[in-house]
Amino acid sequence: MVTMKHKNITILTIVFSIAIIFVSCNSTNKKLDEMKNKSKSGSDNTQSNDTTPKVTGIGGIFFFSDNPKELKKWYSNNLGLETNEWGSTFEYRNANRPEEINYLQWSPFKKGSEYFAPSKKEFMINYRVQNIEGLVKKLQTNGVTILDKIETYDYGKFVHIMDSEGNKIELWEPIDHVLTKVGGKTTK
């Protein structure tokens, strides 16, 4: 018999596995050096001026926890995550701009937090996007529920939407160089 606790552990395992796969799919240092050399020689075709409103990756994985502080400690002690007050920040390289460091935030939230509302789910995914204003217009045209207005911070722009199954989604147009300047320990 599968209990709710086992279902929650399974969901967390799947979500965490996705995050690890995403973060580990980054360019190797050799590939990074090759791309930098191409860029210096002017033959780099990886740069893109594409401003199509779309998702470009996963920006964060958020989920409920009975005790976020203890859970962060468990992940740090057992899986080697570098933790901070929000969870753990994964660092990886942008495949199109290898000199650019990007981030993925992993965060346990205290069970019952209103941050996921109006969703009834125990998780929320943050997607990295480009051209958030254009994306919001596209979503409005498509009849998608937009929960709030775009909010701007030093480290990027955010808006929340609902998908067709009632999952709250956070969209983030990041300004990664600001996060890089802030520094702090990251999981690599």
For each feature predicted by the language model, list its residue ranges:
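C-terminal motif of bacterial Sec signal peptides marking the signal peptidase cleavage site
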Residues: 21-24
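A short, acidic/glycine-rich surface segment
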Residues: 109-115, 179-180
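Vicinal oxygen chelate
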Residues: 26-66, 85-86, 113-188
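Bacterial N-terminal signal peptides that target proteins for export
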Residues: 2-12
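Hydrophobic helical h-region of N-terminal Sec-dependent signal peptides
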Residues: 14-19
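Residue-level signal for short segments within beta-strands and strand-turn junctions
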Residues: 94, 110, 173-175
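Core segments of cupin and vicinal oxygen chelate
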Residues: 52-53, 62-107, 157-159
